[in-house]
C-alpha cells in the first residue's frame, strides 16, 4: 500500500536510479534524474516565497518538464493546476480568474499577459535544474492538502476546479494497483496519451510512478497528425493502453493497431466515456489475448469509482457493457429524485461516497453545495449519471441525466439512441442529437453517422443508406427513438480529452 506518492518516487530514485520514468520517442529520463530535477525546481519555487499551500498553474503539453514540475510543486507544498497547451485563451483566463494562482509556470510559451501574477518560463525551470540544488522535504503536500486541481468544462460554460487531495489520490492509486481487474504489473510500461489537464491522465501516471514503471509520451506535434501518430504508437513497447474508447476507435483505423504488430500490448484501460459493445468487439478481434478493463467515475471522485474486466460473453450478451464493481472503500448507491436509496435492479442517479470524493470546487461554494453532500455519514457526490446495481453489486450505466430529453411525449436518453445505432453492422460510430424549436422544445432527433469502410460504395444515394441502417436496427429500437435525419461524416469531432464532442454537434444542428 502506498502511503505517500513522493516517498514512492524517492524510493525508486534510490533502488532503480537508472530506470526510465519517462520516454518520448527514445528520449529518456530516469528516476534518478526526476529526483534531482524535482528537488532543484522545488528549491527554486521555495525561493519565490509564495503563499503557503497556494495553487500554481502549470501550462504545457505531454513533456518531462511538466512531470518534473508537478513533482516539485508537491514537494514544495503546492497543488498544481494543469492547463493544456491547446486550451483556448478564454478558458485560460476563466481558470485564472477562478483559481487565483500564486504563480504561473509556462513550460510552453504562454499566450496571455496576466497582470499581478508572476510567470516562470521554461528557461528559468531549465536554469533551476542545472543548479542541482539539494532539497529537504519539510512541507510537502499531505493528507487533505490539495494535490492537484483539474478544471472541468462546466455545464454553463464556466469551468469548475475539482480539488483532489493527497488522501483522495491515495484512495484511487492503492485501489488501482491492488485490484484484480486492473492487474497492473510491476514496472508497468504505460502509454501516456490523455493530456495532464484531463483526469484520465492520473490513471496512467499514478500507478506507473507508484510501481516504478515507464511513461511513454508523444510529442504534441505528432498528436495532430493521426496517420503518423498511430504509426508511431504501433512501434512503442507499451504494455498498457489508457485512453477514452473514442481514441481507441481512431487507433483501429490503422491496420498496424493489432496484436501481431504490438505483441507487448496486453492491457486496455478505458474511462472518460462509455465503452460500447462494438468497440470492445473490434478490440477483441484485433487483440485476442488482451485484457479490456472498463472503468467508470467522475473527476469529482478521483478518476474512477468502479472497474470490471470485459469478457467476450459480456460483448455477446449485453446491449450496454457493465461499468464495474465499486471500489471497496467507496460505497456507491442508486437514489431516486427524493434522495431515497433504491434497491438492486432499480434505476436512478448514481452517487458515490467515501475517501475518494473531492472536497468540492475551488472558490465555488454555490456549485459545491449543489453537487456535494453527506450520505450515511460519508462525504458524497451527485454524479448526474443514471444507473443501477445488480444483486452481484455490478454497476450498470444508463446515461446522463442532463442528456435526457422529452420528445413526442417520451423521455429519451440520447446515449441510448446512439448505442442502438452503433449496433448496426454498417455503422462505425453514431451520435444522436436534438434539434430545438423557438420554444426550446425538441423538434426532432438527428443522427451523425460515420459508416464502416466500403459501406457508402454499396449505395447510390444516402437516402438508400439511411433506409438500410434503419432497417438493420428496427428490431431492437423503438420507433419513437429513431432519428428523422441522418448526417454522414468521415469522422466525428473530439474534445481535447479525446471524447466525442456532443456539445459541438448539438450547437451545430441548432445554429448556435
UniProtKB/Swiss-Prot annotation:
Write down the EC number. Answer: 6.2.1.54
PROSITE patterns recorded = AMP_BINDING
Residues bound to ATP:
152-153, 294-299, 385, 397-400, 499
Binding annotation for D-alanine:
199, 303, 499
- What are the subcellular locations of this protein? Cytoplasm
Q: Please indicate if the UniProt record lists ATP-binding as a keyword.
A: yes
What is this enzyme's class at the first EC digit? ligase
| Keyword Ligase found | yes
GO cellular component terms, alphabetically, are: cytoplasm
Q: List the disulfide bonds.
A: none
In alphabetical order, the GO MF annotations are:
ATP binding; D-alanine [D-alanyl carrier protein] ligase activity
User: What's a single GO BP term from this record?
Assistant: lipoteichoic acid biosynthetic process
Q: Which Gene3D superfamilies match?
A: 3.30.300.30, N-terminal domain of ligase-like (3.40.50.12780)
- Describe the reaction catalysed, as an equation: holo-[D-alanyl-carrier protein] + D-alanine + ATP = D-alanyl-[D-alanyl-carrier protein] + AMP + diphosphate
Q: Give the main location.
A: cytoplasm
Source domain of life is Bacteria
Q: In which pathway does it act?
A: Cell wall biogenesis; lipoteichoic acid biosynthesis
Ordered alphabetically, the record's keywords are:
ATP-binding, Cytoplasm, Ligase, Nucleotide-binding
Q: PANTHER family annotated for this entry?
A: ENZYME, PUTATIVE (JCVI)-RELATED (PTHR45398:SF1), PTHR45398
Q: What does this protein do?
A: Catalyzes the first step in the D-alanylation of lipoteichoic acid (LTA), the activation of D-alanine and its transfer onto the D-alanyl carrier protein (Dcp) DltC. In an ATP-dependent two-step reaction, forms a high energy D-alanyl-AMP intermediate, followed by transfer of the D-alanyl residue as a thiol ester to the phosphopantheinyl prosthetic group of the Dcp. D-alanylation of LTA plays an important role in modulating the properties of the cell wall in Gram-positive bacteria, influencing the net charge of the cell wall.
By sequence similarity, the record places it as follows: Belongs to the ATP-dependent AMP-binding enzyme family. DltA subfamily.
- HAMAP family with a match to the protein in the record: DltA
This one is known as: D-alanine--D-alanyl carrier protein ligase
Gene it is expressed from: dltA
Amino acid at each position: 500500500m502506498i502511503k505517500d506518492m513522493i516517498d514512492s518516487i524517492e524510493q525508486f530514485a534510490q533502488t532503480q536510479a537508472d530506470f526510465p520514468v519517462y520516454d518520448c520517442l527514445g528520449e529518456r529520463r530516469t528516476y534518478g534524474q526526476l529526483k534531482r530535477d524535482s528537488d532543484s525546481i522545488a528549491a527554486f519555487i521555495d525561493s519565490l516565497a509564495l503563499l503557503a499551500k497556494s495553487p500554481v498553474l502549470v501550462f504545457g503539453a505531454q513533456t518531462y518538464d511538466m512531470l518534473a514540475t508537478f513533482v516539485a510543486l508537491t514537494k514544495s507544498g503546492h497543488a498544481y493546476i494543469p492547463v493544456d497547451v491547446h486550451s483556448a485563451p478564454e478558458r485560460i483566463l476563466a481558470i485564472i480568474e477562478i483559481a487565483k494562482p500564486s504563480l504561473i509556470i509556462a513550460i510552453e510559451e504562454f499566450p496571455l499577459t496576466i497582470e499581478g501574477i508572476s510567470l516562470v518560463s521554461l528557461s528559468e525551470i531549465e536554469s533551476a535544474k542545472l543548479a542541482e540544488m539539494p532539497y529537504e522535504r519539510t512541507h510537502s503536500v499531505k493528507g487533505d492538502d490539495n494535490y492537484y486541481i483539474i478544471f472541468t468544462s462546466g455545464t454553463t460554460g464556466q469551468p469548475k476546479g475539482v480539488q483532489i487531495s493527497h488522501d483522495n489520490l491515495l484512495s484511487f492509486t492503492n485501489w488501482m494497483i491492488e485490484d484484480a481487474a486492473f492487474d497492473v504489473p510491476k514496472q508497468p510500461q504505460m502509454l501516456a496519451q490523455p493530456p495532464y489537464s484531463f483526469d484520465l491522465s492520473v490513471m496512467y501516471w499514478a500507478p506507473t510512478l507508484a510501481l516504478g514503471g515507464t511513461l511513454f509520451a508523444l510529442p504534441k506535434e505528432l498528436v495532430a497528425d493521426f496517420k503518423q501518430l498511430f504509426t508511431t504508437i504501433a512501434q512503442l513497447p507499451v504494455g498498457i493502453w489508457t485512453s477514452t474508447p473514442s481514441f481507441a476507435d481512431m487507433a483501429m483505423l490503422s491496420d498496424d493497431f493489432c496484436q501481431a504488430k504490438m505483441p507487448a500490448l496486453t492491457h486496455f484501460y478505458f474511462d472518460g466515456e462509455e465503452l460500447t459493445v462494438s468497440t470492445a468487439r473490434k478490440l477483441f478481434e484485433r487483440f485476442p489475448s488482451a485484457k479490456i478493463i472498463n472503468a467508470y467515475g467522475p473527476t469529482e471522485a478521483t478518476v474512477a469509482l468502479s472497474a470490471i474486466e470485459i469478457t467476450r460473453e459480456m460483448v455477446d450478451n449485453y446491449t450496454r457493457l457493465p461499468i464495474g464493481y465499486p471500489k471497496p472503500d467507496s460505497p456507491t448507491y442508486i437514489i431516486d429524485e427524493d434522495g431515497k436509496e433504491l434497491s438492486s435492479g432499480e434505476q436512478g442517479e448514481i452517487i458515490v461516497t467515501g475517501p475518494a470524493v473531492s472536497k468540492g470546487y475551488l472558490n465555488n461554494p454555490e456549485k459545491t453545495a449543489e453537487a456535494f453532500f453527506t450520505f450515511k455519514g460519508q462525504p458524497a457526490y451527485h454524479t448526474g449519471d443514471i444507473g443501477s446495481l445488480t444483486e452481484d453489486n455490478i454497476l450498470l450505466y444508463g446515461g446522463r441525466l442532463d442528456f435526457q430529453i422529452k420528445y413526442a411525449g417520451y423521455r429519451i436518453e440520447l446515449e441510448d439512441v446512439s448505442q442502438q445505432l452503433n449496433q448496426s453492422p454498417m455503422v462505425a460510430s453514431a451520435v444522436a442529437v436534438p434539434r430545438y424549436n423557438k420554444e426550446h422544445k425538441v423538434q426532432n432527433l438527428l443522427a451523425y453517422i460515420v459508416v464502416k469502410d466500403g459501406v457508402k460504395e454499396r449505395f447510390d444515394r444516402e437516402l438508400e443508406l439511411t433506409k438500410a441502417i434503419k432497417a438493420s436496427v428496427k428490431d431492437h429500437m423503438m420507433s419513437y427513438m429513431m432519428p428523422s435525419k441522418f448526417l454522414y461524416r468521415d469522422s466525428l469531432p473530439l474534445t481535447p480529452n479525446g471524447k466525442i464532442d456532443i456539445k459541438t454537434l448539438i450547437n451545430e444542428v441548432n445554429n448556435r
